[in-house]
Structure formats: structure tokens, C-alpha cells
């Protein structure tokens, strides 16, 4: 099961809602549960959305701590995200966060976990 758009928790630069954290904690312990790290900029409800990584960090830290390197999948949510931030800004926010977790995290979150979840087939 893929939880899309981080479970639609509102983002305001503060730690996320306690009930959301508790629910995500319960579901993250189940087998075969992935969470798509997408929708961050849309969930701020601000236009344009914040461009500083620290604004999103409290929510991203919760996701990292619950789903970790093996069950997070990056998604841009483009073109919907374009109403709140440029594609480049959305991707850079995610990249800057996950690069602090190491090169293996980048590979897992940006493509390997997606390949595993969606059962992508190599076509070359």
C-alpha cells in the first residue's frame, strides 16, 4: 500500500499534528506500507509555498523516523505542485533533505523504492 502525499497532513513549519503522527506510526509498522514523499508544497496552503527546507523539516523528520530508507518514495506531484512552487524548488527541497541521510538514501528514495513498490521492469 502506498500512502500518497504524506497522508495529507497540513504543513505550517511546526511539528505535525499529534493524531496524524500517531496514525502514521501505527500504519508504518505494518508490512508492505510505503509513503510517498510528495505534496509538501501543496499542503502548506500558501502561494507561493515556503522555499526553506527548515519549514518542512519537522514533517520530513517524522516521515524519515517512521518509514526510513526502505519505505519512502519521492514524488514531485507535478503539475499540481506548480501552483505552489516550481518543479525545481520541489525537487531541491526533497533532495536537500535526503542528501543529509547519505547517498544510499538518495538512491533508495528517488528510484529504488519506487522500482520495488511498482514492480518496474527494466526495458533495456
Task: Enumerate the language-model features and the residues they cover.
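Catalytic pocket-lining loop regions of alpha/beta-barrel enzymes
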Residues: 1-73, 122
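Mid-to-C-terminal alpha-helical segments outside catalytic/metal-binding sites
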Residues: 61-62, 66-73, 82-124
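Divalent metal-coordination and catalytic microenvironments
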Residues: 5, 35, 77, 106, ...
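Short Gly/Pro-enriched loop/turn and capping motifs at secondary-structure junctions
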Residues: 41-42, 78-81
Amino acid at each position: 500500500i502506498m500512502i500518497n502525499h504524506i497522508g495529507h497532513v497540513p504543513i505550517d513549519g511546526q511539528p505535525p499534528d499529534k493524531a496524524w503522527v500517531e496514525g502514521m506510526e501505527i500504519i508504518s509498522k505494518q508490512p508492505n506500507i510505503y509513503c510517498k514523499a510528495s505534496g509538501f508544497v501543496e499542503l502548506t496552503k500558501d502561494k507561493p509555498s515556503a522555499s526553506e527546507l527548515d519549514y518542512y523539516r519537522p514533517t520530513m523528520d517524522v516521515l524519515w523516523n517512521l518509514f526510513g530508507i526502505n519505505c519512502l518514495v519521492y514524488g514531485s506531484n507535478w503539475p499540481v505542485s506548480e501552483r505552489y512552487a516550481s518543479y525545481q524548488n520541489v525537487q531541491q527541497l526533497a533532495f536537500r533533505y535526503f542528501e543529509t541521510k547519505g547517498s544510499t538514501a538518495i538512491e533508495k528514495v528517488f528510484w529504488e523504492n519506487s522500482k520495488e513498490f511498482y514492480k518496474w521492469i527494466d526495458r533495456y
